[in-house]
């Protein structure tokens, strides 16, 4: 009886039992509830095919999608002090860093690279929202400063893709110090005569909005992106008033003159190339000029 219980039954159960399905195999659209297979979503640049809803795009995928043929030089992550305040809330900050690194396979929030977009050399800086909410800490601030220094040295434009909840509270004042540091870095690039374009993605809030995210020469935004300083709920509780429909969305900000264009994710590389070639006085092909004009009209409609 023992051999049946101990050997045969487990073998049968293992063959007939339910298999574990990865949690991220199917992705649900927040707007329509439609379920999309993860491979189909990745193939469509993390945009829901039917509704057009723009999901959060991983930083590595965004860099690969932006640059020609997905080829670029990754900028190294600067070394900074780890958990200098020995911060702990419900969990040790050092444990949060470890878990986020395992989850994203990144050292910190920021990924930066140098490459070409339609033949035009530029530096791109991308936030990874899945790394502690894309928050700005010492490591992220240092990486951003180094990216601006590289763009200044290379005499090329810089494009920023923020996606952040703001300053990283676990680093306290050391995090807040990154706001003026990154602002100075932006000024350094502008003084060199190079363009700085910001592509606002969902969400862009808090201290990031209060610093480098709103200092671009031109501001683009992805459809439906939430952009603001404080959250809608906090503002309503403070003012004790109901806010307008669509408040803090990319479309609302476009209507009120806070962003220049709302651009679909598939059109971002072409739009950036066209704008940067104009700003750097490089020749723009007639085909690109026509397509870019169509995008601009669609965005402002």
UniProtKB/Swiss-Prot annotation:
Pathway linked to the protein: Lipid metabolism; malonyl-CoA biosynthesis; malonyl-CoA from acetyl-CoA: step 1/1
UniProt source species: Rhizobium johnstonii (strain DSM 114642 / LMG 32736 / 3841)
Cross-referenced SUPFAM superfamilies: ClpP/crotonase
Quaternary structure, from the entry: Acetyl-CoA carboxylase is a heterohexamer composed of biotin carboxyl carrier protein (AccB), biotin carboxylase (AccC) and two subunits each of ACCase subunit alpha (AccA) and ACCase subunit beta (AccD).
Any GO BP annotation: fatty acid biosynthetic process
E.C. no: 2.1.3.15
Record domain CoA carboxyltransferase N-terminal: where: 25-294
Xref: InterPro entries: AcCoA_carboxyl_beta (IPR034733), Acetyl_CoA_COase_Trfase_b_su (IPR000438), ClpP/crotonase-like_dom_sf (IPR029045), COA_CT_N (IPR011762)
Described purpose of this protein according to its UniProt entry: Component of the acetyl coenzyme A carboxylase (ACC) complex. Biotin carboxylase (BC) catalyzes the carboxylation of biotin on its carrier protein (BCCP) and then the CO(2) group is transferred by the transcarboxylase to acetyl-CoA to form malonyl-CoA.
Pfam assignment, any one: Carboxyl_trans
GO cellular component, one term: acetate CoA-transferase complex
Source organism superkingdom: Bacteria
Molecular function GO terms recorded: acetyl-CoA carboxylase activity; ATP binding; carboxyl- or carbamoyltransferase activity
Name of the protein described by the UniProt record: Acetyl-coenzyme A carboxylase carboxyl transferase subunit beta
Keyword list, A-Z: ATP-binding, Cytoplasm, Fatty acid biosynthesis, Fatty acid metabolism, Lipid biosynthesis, Lipid metabolism, Nucleotide-binding, Transferase
Catalytic activity: N(6)-carboxybiotinyl-L-lysyl-[protein] + acetyl-CoA = N(6)-biotinyl-L-lysyl-[protein] + malonyl-CoA
Compartments in which it is found: Cytoplasm
Family statement: Belongs to the AccD/PCCB family.
NCBIfam families with a match to the protein in the record: accD
């Amino acid at each position: 009886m023992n051999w049946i219980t101990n050997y045969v039954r487990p073998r049968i159960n293992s063959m007939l039992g339910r298999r574990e399905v990865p949690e991220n195999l199917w992705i649900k659209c927040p707007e329509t509830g439609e379920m999309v297979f993860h491979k189909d979503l990745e193939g469509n640049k993390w945009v829901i095919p039917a509704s057009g809803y723009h999901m959060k795009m991983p930083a590595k995928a965004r860099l690969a999608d932006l640059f020609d043929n997905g080829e670029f030089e990754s900028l190294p992550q600067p070394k900074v002090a780890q958990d200098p305040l020995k911060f702990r809330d419900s969990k040790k900050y050092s444990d949060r860093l470890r878990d986020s690194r395992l989850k994203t396979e990144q050292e910190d929030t920021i990924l930066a690279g140098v490459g070409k977009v339609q033949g035009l050399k530029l530096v791109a800086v991308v936030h990874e929202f899945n790394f502690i909410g894309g928050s700005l800490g010492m490591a992220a601030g240092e990486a951003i400063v180094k990216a601006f220094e590289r763009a200044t040295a290379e005499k090329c434009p810089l494009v920023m893709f923020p996606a952040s909840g703001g300053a990283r509270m676990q680093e306290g004042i050391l995090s807040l110090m990154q706001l003026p540091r990154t602002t100075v870095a932006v000024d350094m690039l502008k003084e060199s005569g190079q363009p700085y374009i910001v592509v606002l993605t969902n969400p862009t809030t808090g201290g990031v909005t209060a610093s480098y995210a709103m200092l671009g020469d031109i501001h683009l935004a992805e459809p439906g992106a939430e952009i603001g300083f404080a959250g809608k709920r906090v503002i309503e509780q403070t003012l004790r008033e109901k806010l307008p429909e669509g408040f803090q969305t990319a479309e609302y900000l476009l209507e009120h003159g806070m962003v220049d264009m709302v651009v679909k994710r598939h059109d971002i590389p072409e739009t950036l190339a066209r704008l940067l070639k104009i700003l750097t006085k490089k020749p723009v092909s007639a085909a690109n000029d026509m397509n870019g004009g169509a995008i601009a009209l669609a965005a402002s409609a």
